[in-house]
Amino acid sequence: MSDYGFANIEEAKADAIFKLNAQYHQDEDPKKVNMSVGAYRDDTGKPWILPAVKKASKIVEEQASFNHEYLPIAGLPRFTKAAAEVLFRPNPHLLSEDRVASMQSVSGTGANFLAASFIETFYVKHTGAHVYISNPTWPVHRTLWEKLGVTVDTYPYWDAKNRSFDYEGMLSTIKSAPEGSIFLLHACAHNPTGIDPTREQWLSIFESLLSRKHLVVFDIAYQGFASGDLNRDSWALNEFVKYNKDFFVCQSFAKNMGLYGERTGCMHYVAKDASTKNKVLSQLCIVQRNTISNPPAYGARIAAEILNSPQLFAEWEQDLKTMSSRIIEMRKRLRDSLVALKTPGSWDHITQQIGMFSFTGLTPAQVQFCQERYHLYFSANGRISMAGLNNSNVEHVAQAFNHAVRELP
């Protein structure tokens, strides 16, 4: 046996979001508000099981064929096919031409891992390409690629001064990055800023990416949740299809179906032809087999039931509108409350942003002030989950922000 002692290793830092969530649950103050975790809550602050999901769960469990057997390595075919169909609704020819390789994944995180692992093996090792992620972005985007040994660079995204999208900064980096770099893009409801490019800006971004022969990976965690419209939220990646270039998409059903703990997702590779698609799919199966072997079944069965039933699909679309409209209303309430309090600065960015998160622009010191004085729990970078707001606490949150901005300008 080796004499190596594990007592000498460094203790890793706790994940910031999960640490905040734990602190919130330990806090006994009745006015505490949890705006850290990206999970939908209803207006009473409770987790919400979508009505369509409730019905689908019942159908799944009452099926005579229901069991707990292993799924195929690539996942539940009924789910992966339907997941691709809902993603590429405006481009059905992709599926009829057999150009989409779809791998069920452990939610969006697993989808990102599958894409990154494949790209590292079959692209980075041959080209030495770096991956470019937005600054800021979901923290796992960086750590996941770094753990695979890929060099991570960033492109500007958030204009802190104007609290808006840094379009020129992003475009400049795309144009100056070495030819054939990898660019990871948020398809909608950018996390954490909530700011998306306009359609005109997307088109310019795509032209620049293609002129530099960059490889594109889309991450779409909020299809339908962002605006309430499935096609609108997937517009960018479907527009990219028109350029006839291969690309990857990381898809999650955690947010838009509320299947957080079921870890239901899919990774899609869009190929130029069926032959390439089959080769890539075969290699993705090797990655899957050597990591998780095969994906979890229950959430996939629920999602498949919804996606393949016209009645449940229509109800799900209504559920999406219910969630997105409440988030939009909370944005308006928070902004209006800050304006009514005459809080210094402009707060229009709150209603200009979209999706689950808002990048408030508060400093780490102001965030800490809000936690200590008002028992608000949210990220040190000022990101809040709008789902944590409701009609009972939005005024309390506005008062905290107002006090923090005045106390610590």
From Swiss-Prot:
NCBIfam families: PRK09257.1. Homodimer. The gene is aat2. The modification N6-(pyridoxal phosphate)lysine is found at residue 255. Belongs to the class-I pyridoxal-phosphate-dependent aminotransferase family. Its EC number is 2.6.1.1. The keyword ATP-binding does not apply. One of its GO terms (cellular component) is cytosol. Plays a key role in amino acid metabolism. GO terms for molecular function: L-aspartate:2-oxoglutarate aminotransferase activity; pyridoxal phosphate binding. In eukaryotes there are cytoplasmic, mitochondrial and chloroplastic isozymes. L-aspartate binds at residues 38, 138, 191, 383. Keywords: Acetylation, Aminotransferase, Cytoplasm, Phosphoprotein, Pyridoxal phosphate, Transferase. It is found in: Cytoplasm. This is Aspartate aminotransferase, cytoplasmic. It comes from the Eukaryota.
